[in-house]
Amino acid sequence: MPRPENPIQLAVIGAAHGTRGEVRVKTFTGDPLAIAEYGLLYDEQGKSYEVLEARPAKTVVVVRFKGINDRNAAEALNGTELFIDRSQLPDDELDEDEFFQTDLIGLLAVDAEGKTYGVVSALFDFGGGDLIELSEKGKRPMLIPFTEAAVPEIDLDKGTLLVEPYAAGLIADDEDERPQNEKKKPKKS
């Protein structure tokens, strides 16, 4: 397979591990060891990497790539981002209410009346639950909870993410309908 047409970042190579060319790899897969199941991985320049071995090690996976046989070669890979093509992701294994994060980026956030709140620009998990970042030109990005109450429906075909403004914290319970990031701050005396 040539360089991915629709690249999805699967991992990033970290520091060398040992003297035989192994590297520490941070994966972005549900199962970190699944990195070995995707076949060839590619860097941003299109160079391919074949996983020969992968084993867990604390918060990363230790990987041995074909052709990387010593510590110097392994150290040269530090910081390399690894990609696959979007078509290689196992869509058939997802439940109806599961999505790949990459498929949510760029969706338009709208409420039931059709009011737009921006596009999904990022997803975060800071430990308290997933958050969606909504960006709108000329405005500061907003974070909303990625919960069923705040985001009751996702339609990939239409390219929309239905938001419930109150549950998402986009509208206060009082009459003020401005999002939290646009409210006026009290003047200092």
From Swiss-Prot:
Positions of the PRC barrel domain: 96-169
| Entry GO MF terms | ribosome binding
Respond yes or no to whether keyword rRNA processing is given for this record: yes
Matching InterPro entries: PRC_barrel-like_sf, PRC_RimM, RimM, RimM_N, RimM_N_sf, Transl_B-barrel_sf
Q: Supply one GO CC term from the record.
A: ribosome
The GO biological-process annotations, alphabetized, read as: ribosomal small subunit biogenesis; rRNA processing
* Top-level taxon: Bacteria
Q: Name the SUPFAM superfamilies on file.
A: PRC-barrel domain, Translation proteins
* Disordered: region residues: 170-189
* Annotated family: Belongs to the RimM family.
The domain comment in this protein's record states:
The PRC barrel domain binds ribosomal protein uS19.
Quaternary structure annotation from Swiss-Prot or TrEMBL: Binds ribosomal protein uS19.
Q: What is the protein named? A: Ribosome maturation factor RimM
Q: Which organism is it from?
A: Brucella anthropi (strain ATCC 49188 / DSM 6882 / CCUG 24695 / JCM 21032 / LMG 3331 / NBRC 15819 / NCTC 12168 / Alc 37)
Q: Encoded by which gene?
A: rimM
